[in-house]
């Protein structure tokens, strides 16, 4: 049976287990917002194509009560099998809102809904994360580990923030950075 299953799915089943699921229909970001409690806590991804990292970030979002994941046009789907596996299935509990133009969506979130759109920008000494007020509605924006946030998306954000770090370390894995940012929300809103 294992060989037959591997033939059907086209890849090696490490533990001989296969799951079948249905991808939920996409959620329109601006249709979703009126149904969410305030202050909003959102996460957006720009250019995040590593499915494993995306899956762990999804799991982190679920753990910290993020209300929706906004997936920019240059990011991978959080429903890729490796993303689903690394999310430990939490991707099916978190509303996922794909957008065709992340820059435009972020500008609209800020202008029309008062959401602070905060770019995770390693190396920024201007705004360190603990100094940023995240008690109100906010959307953290994370980019790919190699390229970071694209210039157009960075320009669309209302501010940037960096995690204070020592010893010449300039960045963290995106899911780890996400956990630090989201913990700061938990700390400030306590």
Regions from the PLM with identified roles:
Residues 1-11:
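Small-residue-rich anion-binding loops in enzyme active sites
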Residues 1-3, 17-20, 26-125:
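RNA substrate-binding interface of SAM-dependent RNA methyltransferases
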Residues 8, 105, 171-175:
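Short, charged, surface-exposed secondary-structure boundary motifs
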Residues 11, 32-33, 81-83, 129-132, ...:
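Short secondary-structure transition/capping segments
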Residues 12-14, 38-40, 135-136:
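Short connector loops at helix/strand junctions that flank enzyme active sites
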Residues 16-19, 60-64, 75-91, 151-190:
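Structured adenosyl-cofactor binding patch, chiefly the S-adenosyl-L-methionine
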Residues 118-169:
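Active-site/ligand-binding-proximal alpha/beta "capping" segment
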């Amino acid at each position: 049976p294992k060989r037959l299953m591997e033939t059907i799915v086209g890849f090696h089943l490490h533990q001989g287990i296969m799951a079948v699921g249905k991808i939920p229909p996409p959620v329109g970001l601006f249709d979703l917002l009126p149904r969410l409690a305030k202050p909003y806590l959102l996460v957006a991804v720009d250019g995040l194509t590593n499915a494993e990292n995306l899956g762990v970030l999804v799991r982190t979002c679920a753990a910290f009560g993020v209300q929706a994941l906004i997936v920019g046009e240059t990011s991978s789907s959080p429903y890729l099998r490796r993303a689903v596996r690394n999310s430990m299935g939490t991707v099916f509990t978190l509303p996922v809102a794909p957008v065709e133009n992340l820059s435009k969506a972020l500008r609209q979130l800020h202008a029309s809904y008062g959401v602070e759109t905060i770019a995770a920008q390693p190396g920024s000494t201007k705004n360190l994360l603990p100094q940023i007020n995240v008690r109100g509605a906010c959307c953290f924006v994370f980019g790919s580990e190699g390229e970071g946030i694209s210039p157009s998306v960075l320009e669309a954000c209302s501010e940037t923030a960096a995690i204070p770090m020592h010893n010449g370390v300039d960045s963290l894995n995106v899911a780890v950075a996400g956990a630090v940012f989201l913990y700061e929300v938990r700390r400030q809103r306590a």
